[in-house]
Amino acid sequence: MPGLFLTLEGLDGSGKTTQARRLAAFLEAQGRPVLLTREPGGGLPEVRSLLLTQELSPEAEYLLFSADRAEHVRKVILPGLAAGKVVISDRYLDSSLAYQGYGRGLPLPWLREVAREATRGLKPRLTFLLDLPPEAALRRVRRPDRLEGLGLEFFRRVREGYLALARAEPGRFVVLDATLPEEEIARAIQAHLRPLLP
């Protein structure tokens, strides 16, 4: 059986990690093989610390994310899919397009060109976008990292970027209101996923 690749996206504080864990538990309870992973750090764990703590140019930041993603795809995601697992990634390429493209202002054609090589063209079957107003996201974040310290206007651009990506690929994106209760969001994710499960 071929695997299934799912991603969760959204601003920090939107509940992605919580929902990724809930989704993994839901699928495991049905006896489905699941691989839960995340970016950054899914391919090169030491890159995560560097990305979240060092002052970097937007270009260097994106290239480091891309190096991590290339290894993540090669070492984790593709083998998981080949083994027939449901691979759930807490962030993937759309995070870079939203944060480094829309947020930091890097040109989207260049980002996509680098991404094509790093991901080997691999796209998720479904991406759950947990949409949250930036004001609420900043209130929810406990210990801001370097990126979270960029301010409200930055996160408004990132949110608009995510929504633009979702509008461009309505067949892949499921936009969910991240202000809803956790349980309600989990049920909505499960409902959208059921038609894809054998």
From Swiss-Prot:
Name one matching Pfam family: Thymidylate_kin
Q: InterPro entries in the record, alphabetically? A: P-loop_NTPase, Thymidylate_kin-like_dom, Thymidylate_kin_CS, Thymidylate_kinase
- GO BP, one example? dTTP biosynthetic process
> What does the record give as EC number?
2.7.4.9
List UniProt keywords, sorted A-Z.
ATP-binding, Kinase, Nucleotide biosynthesis, Nucleotide-binding, Transferase
Q: Can you name one GO molecular function term for this protein?
A: ATP binding
Name the chemical reaction catalysed here: dTMP + ATP = dTDP + ADP
Which parts of the sequence bind ATP? 10-17
Q: Which superkingdom, per the lineage?
A: Bacteria
A GO-annotated cellular component: cytosol
- Purpose of the protein: Phosphorylation of dTMP to form dTDP in both de novo and salvage pathways of dTTP synthesis.
Q: Output the HAMAP family linked to this UniProt entry.
A: Thymidylate_kinase
Annotated family: Belongs to the thymidylate kinase family.
Protein name according to UniProt: Thymidylate kinase
What organism, scientifically named, is this protein from?
Answer: Thermus thermophilus (strain ATCC 27634 / DSM 579 / HB8)
